[in-house]
From Swiss-Prot:
Residues 61-80 bind DNA. One of its GO terms (molecular function) is DNA binding. The keyword Nucleus applies. It is found in: Nucleus. Belongs to the PCNA family. There is a cross-link at residue 164 (Glycyl lysine isopeptide (Lys-Gly) (interchain with G-Cter in ubiquitin)). NCBIfam families: pcna. This is Proliferating cell nuclear antigen.
Length: 260
């Protein structure tokens, strides 16, 4: 059987919030090393990859590998019934067609028990090659969310230009243009407020803002976000999940003609 217990249950609630608007259903691959998920969005433009390592859970047991087909909207609705302070346990038998979700308050005065029907999903796994990137930008996740939201008022695509001294986000539309430039910070006391840039060569790429705004739903999971870019390959937007794993979003750049 499979059983995973998470004292900080709010993490799982935040993970579902980060997934449910982008993908409707996905296969949760459960093994002794942890839980992983990989899925294209419904329009096959972006890809999301989630890893939750077994040692990030407070207790974890998986006797044999399971592939659980989950409707993310249904799972999100059930997780909304859990309080932010609740302890969450996921449980499934080896050949089960349901996933049990148990929510306990810290004093265990209230225990809620839900069973969610699983789906049969035919999922192809895409190999994601390891890449060296021309530019890797690490910045506060709230700042990135704000930039994407603000520039969405101007246009539907953003040009991200990365150079040694800073990274620039630009959008243009019918009402005009907007440019936001972040300089690399030199001496920030708090690491999660810093902007750091590792650059091998300058990059200038255009991305659809509506997808970036979907990705920023993961902001509550991490104080920082990492953007990895190279010409002609998908951007990677990565949010670390403290002591547990990460959620990575992949988005191919737009061709110049489309964006003009």
């Amino acid at each position: 059987m499979f059983e995973a217990r998470l004292v900080q249950g709010s993490i799982l609630k935040k993970v579902l919030e980060a997934l449910k608007d982008l993908i409707t259903e996905a296969c949760w691959d459960v093994s002794s090393s942890g839980i992983s998920l990989q899925s294209m969005d419904s329009s096959h433009v972006s890809l999301v990859q989630l890893t939750l390592r077994h040692d990030g859970f407070d207790s974890y047991r998986c006797d044999r590998n399971l592939a659980m087909g989950v409707n993310l909207s249904s799972m999100s609705k059930i997780l909304k019934c859990a309080g932010n302070e609740d302890i969450i346990t996921l449980r499934a038998e080896d050949n089960a067609d349901t996933l049990a979700l148990v929510f306990e308050t810290l004093n265990q005065e209230k225990v809620s028990d839900y069973e969610m029907k699983l789906m049969d999903l035919d999922v192809e796994q895409l190999g994601i090659p390891e890449q060296e990137y021309s530019c890797v930008v690490k910045m506060p996740s709230g700042e990135f969310a704000r930039i994407c939201r603000d520039l969405s008022q101007i246009g539907d695509a953003v040009m991200i230009s990365c150079a040694k001294d800073g990274v620039k986000f630009s959008a243009s539309g019918e009402l005009g243009t907007g440019n936001i430039k972040l300089s690399q910070t030199s001496n920030v006391d708090k690491e999660d407020e810093a902007v750091t840039i590792e650059m091998n060569e300058p990059v200038q790429l255009i991305f659809a803002l509506n997808y970036l705004n979907f990705f920023t739903k993961a902001t509550p999971l991490s104080k920082t976000v990492t953007l990895s870019m190279s010409a002609d390959i998908p951007l990677v937007v990565e949010y670390k999940i403290a002591d547990m794993g990460h959620i990575k979003y992949y988005l191919a750049p737009k061709i110049d003609e489309e964006a003009s």
